[in-house]
């Protein structure tokens, strides 16, 4: 089994694929990170600094490795790459005569975020009312216009879609972004959900058996998707067939599981598990093989004490099998009464209907019975502690917000909130940034190109006002985003989608 170890302060990093997996092929790099195209006419209105020699001076750097922030640094960007990182403008040596020099005193530069649970859709509940009731079916409209802009505006320069309901749309959208015709991040396109029978989502194909799972993976791999995701009602046999076919093609597979437990999936060779430890069902009462429980993992999370034997045993199993875990804390924060409200800029991106649905959800949470509120709060704290314990044991934690939940988690804004919640979980700010940047790059096998601020890597960078290493909420103040050395204007991108998320 391939394994790469990277030593950084306080965190063990590794790159591997599940049992029996093939090496990540070099073609994956060219698919996810193709040669950059010049921004076209439709993209230029959102460009603040066209590519060219750019020098960022007097800036604080959080480099993505988990190490302490470094003050008064100079970063030279040229030809879409980080040409140099030095401790002063003088140390950078002679600058190109045509270089654009920015004095970024009072600002911090981070690596571009590598979002690992970053959907391109919105979940709509028809005729949702204040009591939380809606009419079937659940609908999943594609946000091909608004989502890529929201991600890029908030510093997400590479993302994994982590499940698709319109895979052809996602593939075509990626091609348009890569060609410079539409603004958006680099994209690892995940295939359609590999779901079993029983899903409430009418847009998902229910797998008939393991042969269907294998054929589905093969078909979409041939069409260009670069990852796969198993979903709640998939059986062990179907999951095993999907894993084997994905690995045969050098691709990875993750899962938001229910009918299959975390231990079972790890034994089958899965590469990643979504939603931290919030959806594991192994301790749910009455759990039967290949059957999703009514609890959907709530009982397991509530009963699994972070320092208890069940948690330690599970974490050891996942670490020993090199299974990554994706943290998606913002979507679970929605169930905690009194959680932080949407930031005004995020709220402004929602359609009136999405805004109403979000407020319904928030009010329902606040008005839940006291015992339910207490139970959810305790479960959320368990989830935070389990993710921290997983990393302490040597596990690879990656991150994404899961922008669902009636508009309660918004693309891009949710990625930033995820970093804040990782700090709440006990990580240092620099370590939280690492989880959201370099760790995702390592999982994708792209750490030689993205994920940290190092000379020679792609110039995917986020400039924020303030110092997130001391006040993590400063990470919300994104002022400039570089992708392949091109500086994008977050405010222009946000204005273009104002009131649009939830519509298109």
Segments from the language model and where they lie:
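C-terminal cap of metal-dependent C-N hydrolases
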Residues: 458-501
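Active-site neighborhoods of metal-dependent hydrolases
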Residues: 216-229, 234, 279-425, 498-504
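Metal-associated gating/positioning segment near the N- to mid-region
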Residues: 108-181, 200, 205, 211, ...
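C-terminal helical cap
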Residues: 59-61, 373-375, 380-381, 385, ...
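Divalent metal-dependent hydrolysis catalytic cores, especially in the metallo-beta-lactamase
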Residues: 144-167, 185-192, 221-234, 252-254, ...
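Bacterial N-terminal signal peptides
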Residues: 7-18
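Histidine-centered divalent metal-coordination motifs
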Residues: 58, 107, 117-121, 256, ...
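Histidine-rich, glycine-flanked metal-binding segment
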Residues: 38-41, 46-48, 52, 61, ...
């Amino acid at each position: 089994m391939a394994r790469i170890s990277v030593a950084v302060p306080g965190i063990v990093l590794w790159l591997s694929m599940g049992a029996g997996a093939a090496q990540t092929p070099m073609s994956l790099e060219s698919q996810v990170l193709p040669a950059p195209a010049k921004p076209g006419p439709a993209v230029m209105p959102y460009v603040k600094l066209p590519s060219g020699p750019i020098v960022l001076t007097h800036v604080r750097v959080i480099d993505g490795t988990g190490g302490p922030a470094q003050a008064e640094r100079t970063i030279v960007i040229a030809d879409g790459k980080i040409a140099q990182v030095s401790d002063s403008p003088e140390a950078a040596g002679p600058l190109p005569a045509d270089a654009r020099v920015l004095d970024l005193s009072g600002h911090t530069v981070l690596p571009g975020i590598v979002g690992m649970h970053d959907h391109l859709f919105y979940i709509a509940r028809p005729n949702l009312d204040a009591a939380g009731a809606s009419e079937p079916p659940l609908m999943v409209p594609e946000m091909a216009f608004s989502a890529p802009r929201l991600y890029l505006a908030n510093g997400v320069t590479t993302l994994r879609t982590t499940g698709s309901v319109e895979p052809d749309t996602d593939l075509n959208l990626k091609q348009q972004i890569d060609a410079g015709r539409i603004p958006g991040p680099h994209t690892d396109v995940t295939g359609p959900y590999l779901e079993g029978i029983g899903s409430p989502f009418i847009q998902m194909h229910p797998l008939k058996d393991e042969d269907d799972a294998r054929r589905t993976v093969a078909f979409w791999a041939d069409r260009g998707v670069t990852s796969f995701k198993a979903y709640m009602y998939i059986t062990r046999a179907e999951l095993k067939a999907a894993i084997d076919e994905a690995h045969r093609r050098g691709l990875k597979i993750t899962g938001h599981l229910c009918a299959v437990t975390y231990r079972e999936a790890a034994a089958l060779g899965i590469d990643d598990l979504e939603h931290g430890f919030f959806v594991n069902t192994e301790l749910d009462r009455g759990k039967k093989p290949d059957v999703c429980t009514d609890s959907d993992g709530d009982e397991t999370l509530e009963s699994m004490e972070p320092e208890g034997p069940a948690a330690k045993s599970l974490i050891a199993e996942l670490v020993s099998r090199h299974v990554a875990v994706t943290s998606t804390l913002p979507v679970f924060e929605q169930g905690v009464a009194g959680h932080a409200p949407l930031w005004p800029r995020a709220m402004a991106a929602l359609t009136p209907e999405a805004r109403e649905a979000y407020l319904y959800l928030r009010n329902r949470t606040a008005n839940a019975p006291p015992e339910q509120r207490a139970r959810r709060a305790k479960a959320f704290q368990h989830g935070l502690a389990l993710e921290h314990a997983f990393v302490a044991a040597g596990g690879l934690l990656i991150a994404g917000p899961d922008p669902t939940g009636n508009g309660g988690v918004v693309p891009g804004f949710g990625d930033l909130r995820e970093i804040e919640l990782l700090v709440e979980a006990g990580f240092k700010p620099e370590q939280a940034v690492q989880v959201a940047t370099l760790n995702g790059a390592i999982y994708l096998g792209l750490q030689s190109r993205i994920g940290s601020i190092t000379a020679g890597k792609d110039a995917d960078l986020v400039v924020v006002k303030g110092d997130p290493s001391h006040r993590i909420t400063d990470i919300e103040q994104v002022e400039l985003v570089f992708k392949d050395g091109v500086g994008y204007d977050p405010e222009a991108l946000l204005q273009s989608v104002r009131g649009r998320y939830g519509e298109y």
